[in-house]
């Protein structure tokens, strides 16, 4: 694992990393996060009773769109041809939260960690936006890379 910043040149200026010499490999990243809310808000989302509509359906589309646009949103990310995006939601009624998971796949020269993290972030933000009219206490927490595979660093588990 490299202990230096690859996005800085020898003068400390930001640059986009050259990846042309890297081999194409199968890449996969799993990101996770949670949004906490009041119990009645969670129930309305679960039963699809929110005034703005299907919260998780819209959040799923937002996650997919955000994942695909990561290269436009984060300055030093390469635009990637993604081969698969999966978005999963899990209701945790005991802790009044929705757990979000985004799995991204590609075959290419660079990883898809930022894409997975962006997907989780946008799903959580979309849920927040669609529920904020009835719940001003929501919290988005624990957005993290859970797993990745492929490339020079191989398999990484972060949970």
From Swiss-Prot:
Substrate binds at residues 76-78, 114-115. It catalyses: (8S)-3',8-cyclo-7,8-dihydroguanosine 5'-triphosphate = cyclic pyranopterin phosphate + diphosphate. The keyword Lyase applies. It is an enzyme of class 4 (lyase). InterPro entries: MoaC (IPR023045), MoaC_bact/euk (IPR047594), MoaC_sf (IPR036522), MoCo_biosynth_MoaA/MoaC (IPR050105), Mopterin_CF_biosynth-C_dom (IPR002820). It comes from the Bacteria. GO terms for molecular function: cyclic pyranopterin monophosphate synthase activity. Disulfide bonds: none annotated. Its EC number is 4.6.1.17. GO terms for biological process: Mo-molybdopterin cofactor biosynthetic process. Coiled coil: none annotated. Pathway: Cofactor biosynthesis; molybdopterin biosynthesis. Keywords: Lyase, Molybdenum cofactor biosynthesis. The active site is at 129. The keyword Lyase applies. Belongs to the MoaC family. HAMAP family: MoaC_B. Homohexamer; trimer of dimers. PANTHER family: CYCLIC PYRANOPTERIN MONOPHOSPHATE SYNTHASE (PTHR22960:SF29), MOLYBDOPTERIN COFACTOR SYNTHESIS PROTEIN A (PTHR22960). Catalyzes the conversion of (8S)-3',8-cyclo-7,8-dihydroguanosine 5'-triphosphate to cyclic pyranopterin monophosphate (cPMP). NCBIfam families: moaC, PRK09364.1. This is Cyclic pyranopterin monophosphate synthase. It comes from Natranaerobius thermophilus (strain ATCC BAA-1301 / DSM 18059 / JW/NM-WN-LF).
